[in-house]
Amino acid sequence: MASISVNFKGSNTLQQKINLVSGTIRLHFGNGVHNSGYTYKQLAMMLSHGFSSELNGRDYEIPARPIFAAFTKEYKEDIIQIIKDSYKLRFKRVKANEQFTIAANKIRTLAVTALLTGNVPITPDNAKVYKAKKGNLPPWVLTGELVESLEAEYVRK
């Protein structure tokens, strides 16, 4: 599985790198000195709560839903376009963290839509786990335990 890399260089700009092999999404803010990498498991734990990451002593709210390797593979072009569009906002003097929030919200909406419409491939084994674990939660809210099994499955391929 090839990795997707989208890097934007320059000071005070958003940089984002999506790596399908390791299952890690790495986010870079500002000049790239302060960065934080999130695994799919960590993204899943954010669920609907949003996520605050301390970067350079400041908290940025990162609203994100779990993004799986299968999702990034299926919607690669859409994701890259969303990131490019959000990056263009710098010309309108939108701050880097706001650029990311806009991109994250669009990617989250795309992910939820993909999960709800069944466009993200899930193996029969994982589908059984998914049905058993979700309980009364909305279908796109996944537990950390389930995400571990999905992550292991997709990273193995």
Identify the residue ranges that each predicted region occupies.
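Short, Lys/Arg-rich flexible segments
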Residues: 1-157
